[in-house]
């Protein structure tokens, strides 16, 4: 039942609404009277009287807080680059939500979402990297979050084709930044004579690296691989499983992709390196290490950091890769599972996140990076603090910083 008092209150409310509607001009712009009420008071320092009303009303909503906005990596602009074919960029973040080539725990298909969510505290307004003296989000580079490559979870052969074609599509574009008139650097010049953009992949299980290397091979030929991992990932599939259960489709796993890439001639023989190894080998001898050497890798075991330190690790990597084009592959399980539990094949005795960040920073300026990936983040197995996703997002920040600070050609800034 409406009482007399409630009817009076309703009438007053309707009167106020009608008055507000009447104050709006026919061209949908707010009237000066309403604008005056919306504008900040004169004693607020952030008001810019030089801006017209439309600009002012738009500009005051530009800023996102760390916890607001849709989930893109570091609040970067999101473009579905595979759909928007005319979109160019210098560096793109691309997710590959795939985990059906794992040997143990799944969940890495949720890695791209987890890493993006964990990156929410990275913002242009507070993105300066004091160790590398650069803010990658306020620089010459046009950086986008290009979303994910849609991949099948039912057919791994189809999924690899989707990944490869997606990578080639993105890499085929011309980088946004023009070369400087006095450009003397040609390291990043592709076989077609064009400077192409660079991609950083959010995995996904580690098998996605094969598709990335196939795409890079299309533009650059073979490249060197710096591979941070607790496992070799150069397992010979013919030895790994009994021959009577063998199938060609089963050859492709997150532990065989670098072996396959080497056999396809995608990896430089002798200038690629694993770092952080600490797993068991197959059989009763060192066959896995011998096979790894045959496919062109050398390696650093995790415990060597106790003897030669971070600087020693960095020097070994630099000596191996030299000035070749480099693909940087970081399996999050290189980090000790006590610090990064959210992964599919954890191994105890790993490096700390501080050691990994220090290695990445000390490699800055010494690598011709053509691409990178951070893989094997499995949010379902992460802790309540989302430590694994956070570590992955921080590693990507270091990679982005290095890519921006050291472009593969002299850019016009």
From Swiss-Prot:
* EC nos: 3.5.3.11
Q: Which Gene Ontology MF annotations are present? A: agmatinase activity; metal ion binding
InterPro entries, A to Z:
Ureohydrolase, Ureohydrolase_dom_sf, Ureohydrolase_Mn_BS
Tell me the GO BP annotations in alphabetical order.
putrescine biosynthetic process from arginine, via agmatine; urea metabolic process
Q: One Pfam family this chain carries?
A: Arginase
What's the catalysed reaction?
agmatine + H2O = urea + putrescine
- Supply one GO CC term from the record: fungal-type vacuole
The coenzyme or cofactor needed here is:
Mn(2+)
The protein, known as: Putative agmatinase 2
To which species is this protein native?
A: Schizosaccharomyces pombe (strain 972 / ATCC 24843)
Q: What lineage does the source organism belong to?
A: Eukaryota, Fungi, Dikarya, Ascomycota, Taphrinomycotina
């Amino acid at each position: 039942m409406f009482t007399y008092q409630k009817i009076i209150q309703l009438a007053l409310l309707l009167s106020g609404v009608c008055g507000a509607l009447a104050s709006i001009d026919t061209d949908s712009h707010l009237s000066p009277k309403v604008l005056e009420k919306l504008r900040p008071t004169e004693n607020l320092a952030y008001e810019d009287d030089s801006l017209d009303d439309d600009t002012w009303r738009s500009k005051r909503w530009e800023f996102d807080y760390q916890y607001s906005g849709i989930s893109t990596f570091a609040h970067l602009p999101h473009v579905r680059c595979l759909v928007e074919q005319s979109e160019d960029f210098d560096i793109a973040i691309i997710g590959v939500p795939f985990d059906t080539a794992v040997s143990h725990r799944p969940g890495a298909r949720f890695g791209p979402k987890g890493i993006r969510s964990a990156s929410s505290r990275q913002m242009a307004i507070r993105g300066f990297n004091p160790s590398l003296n650069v803010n990658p989000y306020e620089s010459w580079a046009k950086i986008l979050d290009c979303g994910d490559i849609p991949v099948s979870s039912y057919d791994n052969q189809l999924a690899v084709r989707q990944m490869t074609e997606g990578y080639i599509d993105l890499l085929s574009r011309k980088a946004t930044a023009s070369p400087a008139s006095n450009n003397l650097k040609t390291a990043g010049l592709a076989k077609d004579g064009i400077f192409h953009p660079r991609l950083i992949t959010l995995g996904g299980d580690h098998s996605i690296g094969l598709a990335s290397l196939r795409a890079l091979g299309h533009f650059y030929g073979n490249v060197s691989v710096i591979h941070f991992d607790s496992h070799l990932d150069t397992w010979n599939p013919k030895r790994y499983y009994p021959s009577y259960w063998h199938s060609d489709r089963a050859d492709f796993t997150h532990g065989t992709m670098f072996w396959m890439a080497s056999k396809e001639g995608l990896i430089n023989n002798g200038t690629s390196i694993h770092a952080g190894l600490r797993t068991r080998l197959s059989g009763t001898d060192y066959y896995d290490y011998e096979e790894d050497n045959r496919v062109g890798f050398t390696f650093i075991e995790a415990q060597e950091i106790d003897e030669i330190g971070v600087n020693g690790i960095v020097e070994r990597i630099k000596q191996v890769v030299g000035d070749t084009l480099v693909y940087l592959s970081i399996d999050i399980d290189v980090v000790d599972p006590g610090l990064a539990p959210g992964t599919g094949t954890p191994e105890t005795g790993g490096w700390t996140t501080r050691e990994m960040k220090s290695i990445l920073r000390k490699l800055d300026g010494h690598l011709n990076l053509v691409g990178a990936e951070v893989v094997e983040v499995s949010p379902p197995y992460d802790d309540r603090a989302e430590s694994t996703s956070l570590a992955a997002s921080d590693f990507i920040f270091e990679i982005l910083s290095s890519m921006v600070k050291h472009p593969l050609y002299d850019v016009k800034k």
